């Protein structure tokens, strides 16, 4: 589903390339993640101004726990700092902050900060800024099935029967999925809801991805004809 003038309603981004960006500059990997935060700010504003109603960012996957312990701890610290500091700006800009993933597996204080951000921005009516943290597309499907079974559901007549049990069932399917960093895969991102998404791959590392590149991705999307399997 689209907004006016071919603007995708929901854009999802795999924010890849922070580590390589840092390595090429002789910096620790965590500095690449810090640089990536600045890009989050720019792209969030740009997406809102373009008319995107939902922007989802793949911030930490279920596989990212396998990274060096220091990097994982640094990322958790970055989540604490960024989310807590972002609440007032989100309220000022009338935007909601939301989270998708197995949040229960995160450190308890991080969970508390995420819940606080959702509560304090929950009444805003502008763009949804969604961070996928400890997220995996396969895990989302498995968790959804287990939640459905726990609620007493024993069969699914259609795919719509599973949607209420996914992480964010009210969020529209992503129209456009973008990956930065030059890799040509989506790495377990929105496997269920992204079944009919259009893809756009950028060679730019995430810290170098900017509003102009986002506009290029959306312009590419607007030129495509989405047929959903029809002729």
Residue ranges, per PLM feature:
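Flexible, compositionally biased loop and terminal segments
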Residues: 1-231
């Amino acid at each position: 589903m689209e907004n006016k003038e071919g603007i995708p309603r929901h854009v999802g981004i795999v924010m890849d390339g922070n580590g390589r960006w840092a390595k090429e500059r002789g910096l620790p990997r965590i500095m690449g993640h810090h640089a990536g935060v600045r890009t989050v700010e720019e792209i969030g504003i740009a997406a809102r101004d373009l008319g995107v109603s939902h922007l989802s960012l793949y911030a930490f996957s279920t596989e990212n726990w396998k990274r060096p312990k220091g990097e994982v701890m640094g990322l958790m610290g970055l989540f604490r700092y960024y989310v807590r500091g972002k609440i007032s700006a989100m309220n000022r800009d009338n935007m909601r902050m939301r989270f998708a993933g197995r949040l229960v597996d995160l450190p308890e204080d991080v969970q508390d900060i995420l819940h606080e951000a959702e509560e304090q921005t929950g009444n805003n009516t502008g763009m949804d800024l969604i961070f996928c943290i400890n997220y995996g597309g396969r895990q989302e499907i498995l968790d959804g099935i287990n939640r459905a079974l726990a609620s007493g559901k024993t069969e699914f007549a259609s795919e719509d029967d599973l949607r209420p049990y996914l992480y964010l069932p009210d969020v529209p399917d992503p129209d456009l999925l973008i990956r930065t960093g030059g890799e040509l895969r989506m790495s377990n991102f929105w496997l269920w809801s992204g079944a009919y998404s259009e893809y756009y791959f950028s060679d730019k590392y995430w810290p170098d991805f900017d509003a102009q590149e986002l506009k290029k991705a959306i312009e590419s999307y607007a030129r495509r004809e989405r047929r959903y399997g029809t002729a």
